[in-house]
A protein has these predicted regions:
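Conserved HGGG/HGGXW glycine-rich cap/lid loop of the alpha/beta-hydrolase fold
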Residues: 51, 55, 62-109, 329
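Conserved alpha/beta-hydrolase catalytic His-Asp/Glu region
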Residues: 196-256
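Conserved acidic catalytic loop of the alpha/beta-hydrolase fold
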Residues: 121-139
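Conserved serine/cysteine hydrolase catalytic core
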Residues: 230-298
Length: 346
């Protein structure tokens, strides 16, 4: 009788157990350094000290089958990780580039120190130290979103090391605080970050990154982020993100675009509407923020050796939304002849 009762109870539990297993497969939990999320190439670690912290930068170093003698460094955005560059790494490596794709400190598989003065200068210096440890000096630098702001700062700090600069829907082409976006404390950003869910990520990415469209191809990147917020490091991930939010909103680079001296390929999805803190701004101001068709043209006019490539129907992440179109334009734009003979917006 007892055995029959136990078997009956177990059978009754099976649907719940199956549902739980299904949920864990579709709603994974990842560690604070994205433990459990697979990257497309082996992840290496650069260990160093900064601001009295012993830190690690995770990175992928992908060697081409037929080298062209050039190295490309890919800098990810705030809601992205080095893994999201997979298609771009493939395209560049197939074209002969050695490709180095790091996760910045505070992001993804890299260290997330609780006490750290985040600045684009510091992240640039960290990246420069990583490249020096690999014996890499002259690079083609590709930055997307927040990585675009970082790439601009890196190119300003180390102009002799950057042969070419490609900016993919970089944020920071406008100064939000100068446009009346209210200042937020790190504590306020932290409270906002704690409300992050897969649904909130998906809705934001659908409207901003992919111009109102959605594809199952995008879902792994939603779960990549949401999994860290579901996991045991949720508090640390939210705090690190808040520190980065503060850095982005208080350290504009737009006023220094005219100081860039290397050839710059500026790639803009015209459906992009990204503006950090847009929802905090007065409604009249909100409507003017994140106008990427205008911002791209204004930036290209400021940069001495700029070539502007626009994607009329794409949003904030053209390399993910339309990889074939994007990578064709990227490779064509990075050809030495294309960059050296084009000056001004196109």
């Amino acid at each position: 009788m007892a055995l029959a009762f136990a078997l009956g109870a177990l059978l009754a539990m099976m649907p719940a157990l199956e549902a739980s297993a299904a949920q864990s497969a579709t709603e994974p939990l990842y560690g604070p350094e994205l433990q459990g999320f697979p990257y497309p190439w082996p992840v290496e670690r650069f260990r160093f000290e900064s601001q009295r912290n012993r830190l690690e930068m995770a990175f992928m170093d992908v060697r081409p089958g037929s080298p062209n003698g050039r190295a490309a460094v890919l800098l990810h955005g705030k809601n992205f990780c080095a893994a999201t560059w997979k298609n771009t790494i493939d395209a560049l490596a197939n074209a002969g580039y050695r490709v180095i794709a790091p996760d910045q400190v505070g992001f993804c598989k890299s260290s997330k120190p609780t006490r750290y003065q985040y600045s684009f200068q510091q992240l640039a210096a960290n990246t420069h130290a990583l490249l020096a440890s690999l014996g890499v000096s002259h690079v083609t630098l590709v930055g997307h979103s927040t990585g675009g702001m970082l790439a601009i700062r890196y190119a300003l700090m180390y102009p002799d090391d950057v042969d070419q600069l490609a900016l993919v829907d970089p944020i920071g082409l406008e100064d939000w605080k100068a446009k009346s976006v209210p200042w937020q404390s790190v504590d306020a950003w932290y409270r906002r970050e704690l409300h992050t869910t897969a649904e909130s990520i998906r809705n934001y990415e659908r409207s901003t990154y992919y111009a109102g469209t959605w594809s199952p191809v995008y879902e792994p990147w939603v779960q990549m982020l949401a999994g860290m917020y579901r996991g045991p490091g949720r508090d640390l991930v939210a705090w690190s993100s808040a520190l980065v939010d503060d850095m982005i909103c208080t350290q504009p680079v737009v006023y220094e675009l005219s100081e860039l001296r290397m050839p710059v390929l500026l790639m803009i999805g015209d459906k992009d509407t990204t503006a950090i803190g847009k929802d905090l701004a007065p409604s009249a101001v909100r409507a003017t923020l994140g106008n990427y068709p205008a911002l791209g043209k204004e930036a290209a006019a400021r940069i001495p050796l700029a070539r502007l490539v626009e994607f009329p129907d794409l949003g904030h992440a053209p390399q993910i939304q339309a990889p074939d179109m994007f990578h064709q334009a990227l490779l064509e734009g990075l050809r030495p002849a294309a960059l050296s003979t084009n000056s001004g917006a196109r």
